[in-house]
Amino acid sequence: MHVQLKLILDCDPDAAWRAIKSPTVLTELYGPLLQPESQEGAFPTIWGPGSHAVTLKALGLVPVGGQDIRLDFQEHRADGVRMMHDSGAPLSGPLTLLTRWDHRMAIAPAPGEPTKTLYRDRLEISGAVAPALWYPLWSLWQWRGARMVQMAPTWAFDPELEKDEEPGANTGDAAAGAPTDDGTRFDADDSTL
């Protein structure tokens, strides 16, 4: 069985890639429903390859299980798609009844809109209880997708300011009546120019 999302995110693919590799973004995506906490003391700034043990708490209060997030990345595919793959497994809680957990996230430029991101997310599960857990996981994925769409515009870096856009920079084009560097006022019809 599987749960999947296919979304257009209002941010460029580089920003989306940084976001899905961020434990902070993960925490914001699931909040306030689920609160992931590192079992290793603290989350890294950016997810790296390997295992990361996490405890999940409902509403930040009630432990609902642990998860081994086991990550690998494909960042340089010929088709330009970047992939993050979580092949981890539930460590405790109801999800341990699943026999398979395979989660893949793909980032690519949106077709015809290179400043936006095509985001694809697929979770495959199996086991005798998979049919019973499918709907709760599907619901959580819908929440996650809605949060991604909401948060994506905030993921971009602020643009670098050009030299004459920097605060306090003198562009030489003072507006009429605006104070100049020496405190006098510039008037567009000043005949002393």
Give short role names for the model-derived ranges.
Residues 81-139:
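Beta-strand/loop substructures that line and gate deep hydrophobic ligand-binding cavities in soluble
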Residues 28, 37-92:
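Glycine-rich portal/gate segments that line the openings of hydrophobic small-molecule binding cavities
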Residues 1-6, 13-15, 51, 83, ...:
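Intrinsic-disorder/low-complexity, polar/charged segments enriched in Ser/Thr/Lys/Arg/Asp/Glu/Gln
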Residues 2-4, 64-70, 98-104:
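Short, surface-exposed coil-to-beta transition loops
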Residues 120-166:
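A conserved amphipathic terminal alpha-helix motif
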Residues 1-50, 192-193:
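Hydrophobic ligand-binding cavity/cleft-lining segments
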Residues 150-173, 177, 181-193:
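Short, highly charged C-terminal tails/helix-capping segments
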Residues 8-12, 57-59, 108, 122-126:
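Solvent-exposed residues in well-ordered beta-strands and their adjoining turns
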